Design a protein with these regions (language model features):
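Hydrophobic alpha-helical segments at protein termini of multi-pass membrane proteins
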Residues: 2-200
């Protein structure tokens, strides 16, 4: 029951945080570039549907985000195992056999649930922070803040295609967070083993 409450809390918190970043991004975009000439969203640039397209794109993105958050925090149930070795645990939950560990998990899993949950959790955790970078960019442009820090910041941003440092950080961040998810799930597994031992 406690796990369900925590899962629902994390679901609502992450969805609220991401919705807030979407609203701020759209608001600051409108203030900074009402004609969307400065808009750098690669999907928008390919379609050029104006504000209707940009808002629709954000709605679709948010629906996808909700689906990922729901799977990561509510739908996914951690498998029950007796494995106390992380490699054997990963092999068991992904391939159905504790003896078939695959380094760096390059082989496609037999059980897709853990991989999907790991991906969803990582993306859901990293996206609001990456989206805030865009909000910060618009904010600094609107206020025309000019100092050494903003010069360094925008110089770094300019190094990325279309200035989309957020996409780069989202990919790197999600990759790093996948290891955090694995460690978190393994610790949960060890706690459950201990709990079952104490009950017997």
């Amino acid at each position: 029951m406690e796990r369900k409450k925590k899962g629902k809390f994390n679901f609502y918190l992450s969805c609220s945080a991401y919705l807030l970043t979407i609203i701020l991004d759209l608001l600051f975009t409108y203030i900074a570039t009402p004609n969307l000439l400065l808009e750098g969203n690669p999907l928008y640039n390919q379609t050029n549907f104006g504000w209707t397209g940009l808002i629709a794109l954000n709605v679709i993105t948010f629906i996808g985000y909700i689906a990922m958050a729901w799977y990561a925090f509510i739908k996914y149930q951690s498998p029950i195992t007796n494995e106390t070795d992380m490699k054997r645990y990963l092999a068991l939950i992904n391939y159905g056999n504790a003896d078939s560990y695959v380094p760096m998990m390059w082989k496609l899993p037999k059980n897709w649930g853990p991989q999907t949950a790991c991906l969803c959790w990582s993306v859901v955790c990293v996206l609001p922070f990456c989206r805030m970078i865009i909000v910060l960019e618009w904010f600094l442009m609107i206020l025309r803040v000019r100092n050494i820090f903003t010069e360094i910041f925008f110089t770094i941003v300019a190094c990325f295609p279309l200035g989309r440092i957020d996409i780069f950080l989202a990919v790197i961040g999600a990759w790093i967070l996948s290891f955090v998810w694995i460690k978190k799930e393994f610790k949960k597994n060890l706690k459950n083993i201990e709990k079952r031992r104490n009950q017997n």
